[in-house]
């Protein structure tokens, strides 16, 4: 993959090496349940959506959406095609969700429909997908309009195959108001015979109108597509629309030709060039190097000119110029070196090594046109020398003082089933990767919006902790800042086999994860205790404690959505919206 290799710089001041553990707290968590008028518009996977990518993209979809500019407001889409808004004004007097928008077309008529999705591009703009392939851009006006349900369609257009909205932004560029949106789909790939038979498409759509035309029509400026073989964990557009950042198991690439999504990139074209027939073959023994190649059609021995120099070789063909010229890997004996014509158009050049026993790594330095053919006897000799370092048995000496790793002792977080995960930044102008970070042993955990005006944050596991990173596109030398740490959370979440959603509070006061059904786990940051505690085992005083709390829903319906504010957790099931009071209002 192109792009400069970078690394993430951990802020050591945000780490707590003395953190011990979370203490289970039995303090009650007030939970308020709101019954829904209509069930959530859940779309289950079809029989032809059988891959892991389908499950990640659509089977584990979060049906509950938050407005970062109104943190105590959440939204969902029900089976009556309505976008429903729920806002907490008073914990003891919960209202009912209200309709703010209704899709104008019948969604059930589409056989390959996906779940409807939405994202707040700004405080006044929302992007919506109905799950059938149509994109909506909605103006919601001021806060009172968003609560009263007066949302206005400013753009709607069918873009092709069904998709979900991943991320969107609103910006002003060159006197244009631009809405950028990322759309994700998993498409059938007939050319992928050995793989799953699908590829992942991430489309970057830019729609715009003149800034001074409040009621002007929006038109699509650009449509750019990224192709890959895995659903990205994280994908977001930079605030000014200059690039895209993503985290994925497998690499993505832009395609310039929308009509031919399988057109190879420049890198792939170079790879294809490298796969062509070699210009020549060469092999070696301890005393000499042999080079063989074919003369072009119509050429004879008289058309060939070969010059030997102690450290160079020059082969040219009449009317065709230089065939091979350059510095040899090591010096040769010119008097003993020779060449002969073989049967047909074959030419064999023998170079006598000046230093017998020296193994050449290449024939002509930096020349990639030839192919090395290993001598079977030499290969066997090397294998015999290395025999003592290899074994056909998994553990040939189980009584050894240092036995090999026991796979049964590995945790989930220690096993990497797929290719190495990368964090990449793609330039929006040249459509190439400019920065690449190999995450290696830092698995992705979750995504969260801490500051609405900035890109979403993402959390990665570092050792046992979960570190929260804020992308900052204005700092090319330090694109990702470490802004918060959740102690031991990386270790804790690895033990939760049934976890479904993961999030945290915007002020980082707590993190939370939920299982597929009922249970929610809350992990609070360390806070001072009212009375000082004494650790008798270590003989020291403890001034602060990190608490863990567990909440359990009354319903056994599967959890479909999960969002957090500084004070509350919102949990969505098929027919109920539960509000858990986590913190008191500051």
UniProtKB/Swiss-Prot annotation:
| Annotated PANTHER family | CHRONIC MYELOGENOUS LEUKEMIA TUMOR ANTIGEN 66 (PTHR21664), NUDC DOMAIN-CONTAINING PROTEIN 1 (PTHR21664:SF1)
> A Pfam family this protein belongs to?
CS
Record-given protein name:
NudC domain-containing protein 1
Gene name linked to the record: nudcd1
Q: What InterPro entries does the entry give?
A: CS_dom (IPR007052), HSP20-like_chaperone (IPR008978), NUDCD1 (IPR037895)
Under SUPFAM superfamilies, the record lists: HSP20-like chaperones
**Annotated localization:** Cytoplasm; Nucleus
Taxonomically, the superkingdom here is Eukaryota
